[in-house]
Amino acid sequence: QLTEMAEKLGVIQKVVGGRRVTDDETLELAKMVFRGKINTEILAQFRRRGIKAVGLSGVDGGVLTAERRPPKSVLDRTTGVTDVVDLGHVGDVVKIDASLIEVMMNNGYLPVLSSLGADDHGQIFNINADTIAAEIAVALKAEKLILLSDVNGIYLDPADAASKISRLPIAEARKLIESGRATGGMIPKLESLI
């Protein structure tokens, strides 16, 4: 929905290696769309089903401490050219403080986190939602992590429907990324599982 809103407002988006480059304008949109529009719509769906949910971002209560992701070398598999890319206001999770989440859950509330976090200086970052989910699952010592996606699954060969896999060992996930067979938004999903 961030891409959709950016298009409506004429804000040009750039994605490199499945990760969004978050410039100043895109960060402002991310705050509006993730914490506002998307989070509120999800909360409304839970309410409709009688579930008491509370909307948060990683900034709230210091749930998530992040740091700016440093520029990194990215290979463009179509051209074979490697370039150093600065993803802008994209952050990496440094620490999860799950105490607020635990208090909410222990009192019958379902926390719904949007994918924003901040550093100790209050700088806000756009963080991949799958990465946040994995980090929170670890902090909560969750038995399972279920990631939802708008794609039908992981395929060894995206052109072959019969190559869909239901279980993926960590070593195989790494190979899919390193070989370039995993592309776009599937890369951060696999990285969050590794």
Model-derived features: where do they sit?
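Nucleotide/pyrophosphate-binding catalytic subdomain
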Residues: 1-194
